[in-house]
């Protein structure tokens, strides 16, 4: 108490967690290890905004962004960016990009109604495609949803699909191979091919995913929940094996780990090597294959990518059995993609190097065999 003061000083510190819990009793699921920064939004009085003069927090956060950008950081992944007012990003990101034009900003935004706001007003380069493509592919891989849902998923983005970041694992989500997801990393291969190859946008791989990391350790706080802990000091089995005591030669990996890694390596390499994936147009074939007599729209998904005289015919199979499918290629696909119609095309499966003959005609189905939990990327040049 200040000397001579009539009343003792009573302090009433702000009690706010990062997830907007405004009391002193957060529960175990609240972000009690975080604090809420003051970006100029009065959350306790209707969320009113006070952005003039520029909040001091904005200035400090811009300084932090510029500091790390000056150290050579090539991008920022902004956790739960939608919990920070879009006005801040609108103000800060252009200033960082003015000094560092090549830097990327990726936002974790889970509300589709806010996607365009954070892309076009907030100036983010990419947004997490979690509640759309990730959730859909996970449900399809687990048998809870039809593969036809993938079409509705990309259509719902209505033109911003190139600005979405695709992924199948991240620090928040359960591992594909865990008992809480697919229980087998091979079941994620069709989803990998779709997620990586259906558009020109980026694909994120979470460490250990390429080896089929189980995420089934019983860590301290995190517990056995199918995730790799972000709360405990821990190490990851497949990464330890890959490191091999600092040799980084992968010799401790199992043959199953190595096989899966080779698939991931091949698919991701194709994303950069194949111009049809990196720059080409996309055509979804599913609408022409509903209720197909030799095509299960619930277990298979098929589409095309094309650039100039190169065509990729991509088919994936989420089923546990090898399938012989007959795929209808509609006349509109030939017109839109400008594909010459031919009875016999020599095609190369870019995943295996195997060659096969296929027909591409609007009145005759294209016959292809696809293995269980697998896919084909057939390349045709004309």
What are these regions (language model features)?
Residues 86-98, 109-141, 214-222:
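Substrate-binding cleft/loops of secretory-pathway carbohydrate-active enzymes
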Residues 358-382:
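C-terminal beta-strand-rich structural cap/linker in extracellular carbohydrate-active enzymes
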Residues 161, 170, 175-345:
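Loop/helix patches that line or flank the sugar-binding groove of alpha-linked glycan CAZymes
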């Amino acid at each position: 108490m200040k000397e001579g003061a009539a009343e003792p000083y009573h302090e009433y510190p702000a009690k706010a967690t990062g997830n907007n819990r405004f009391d002193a009793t957060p529960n175990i699921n609240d972000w009690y290890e975080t604090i809420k920064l003051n970006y100029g939004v009065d959350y306790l009085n209707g969320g009113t905004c006070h952005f003039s003069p520029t909040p001091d927090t904005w200035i400090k956060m811009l300084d932090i962004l510029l500091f790390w950008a000056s150290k050579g950081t090539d991008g920022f992944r902004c956790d739960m960016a939608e919990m920070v007012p879009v006005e801040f990003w609108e103000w800060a990101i252009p200033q960082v990009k003015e000094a560092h034009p090549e830097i990327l900003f990726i936002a974790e935004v889970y509300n589709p109604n806010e996607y365009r706001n954070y892309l076009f007003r907030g100036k983010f380069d990419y947004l997490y495609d979690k509640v759309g493509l990730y959730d859909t592919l996970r449900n399809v891989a687990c048998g809870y949803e039809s593969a036809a849902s993938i079409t509705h998923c990309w259509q719902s983005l209505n033109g911003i699909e190139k600005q979405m970041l695709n992924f199948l694992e991240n620090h928040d989500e359960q591992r594909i191979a865990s008992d809480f997801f697919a229980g087998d990393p091979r079941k994620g291969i069709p989803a990998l091919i779709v997620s990586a190859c259906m558009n020109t946008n980026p694909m994120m791989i979470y460490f250990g995913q390429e080896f089929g990391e189980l995420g089934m350790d019983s860590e301290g706080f995190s517990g056995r929940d199918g995730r790799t802990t972000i709360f405990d000091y821990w190490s990851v089995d497949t990464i330890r094996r890959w490191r091999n005591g600092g040799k980084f030669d992968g010799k401790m990996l199992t043959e199953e780990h190595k096989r899966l890694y080779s698939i991931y390596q091949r698919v991701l390499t194709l994303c950069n090597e194949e111009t049809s994936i990196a720059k080409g147009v996309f055509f979804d074939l599913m609408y022409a294959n509903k209720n197909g007599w030799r095509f299960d729209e619930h277990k298979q998904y098929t589409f095309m990518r094309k650039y100039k005289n190169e065509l990729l015919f991509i088919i994936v199979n989420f089923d546990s059995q090898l399938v012989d499918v007959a795929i209808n290629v509609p006349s509109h696909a030939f017109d839109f993609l400008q594909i010459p119609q031919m009875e016999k095309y020599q095609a190369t499966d870019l995943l295996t190097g195997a060659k096969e003959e296929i027909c591409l005609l609007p009145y005759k189905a294209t016959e292809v065999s696809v293995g269980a939990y697998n896919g084909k990327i057939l390349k045709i040049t004309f």
